[in-house]
Amino acid sequence: TMSTSSRQEAMEGEPVRRHVSDAILNYDKPVYGLFLAIKIDTNTAETFRHGIWYAKGDVKQRLDIVPLSLEQFRRHFVSMFEGKQARPEHLRDLILQCETERDNLEAPAWMRYIETVVVERSSMVCGR
């Protein structure tokens, strides 16, 4: 999204979670979501940190959605190609590692953790 304000969560929080939920229901494989924005609003990060969605029939789902700034995504994406490591597993592993601390951290700290993970993983796949 191009939004950077607190409106970001209001405009994108529900549709992104709904789309990921729909994909989970439609595909018999793991589903991961990336939310990309110029800058991630803290309230948006908090929405995805919880990652809860109720599908039809009040079926509770825990969604795997990680918010990344465009710069964070660019850094990781470019590093995969520079390191000749452009594989979907690297993006999946980035998402999974970013999620490891979401239940232990509040949104501001989780956003800092995500930044640390992006920097470390980008260096790793690039071979720096």
Task: List each language-model region with its residue ranges.
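Catalytic core segments in nucleotide and nucleic-acid processing enzymes
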Residues: 1-115, 121
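N-terminal, leucine/charged-rich tether regions that mediate assembly and partner docking
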Residues: 119-128
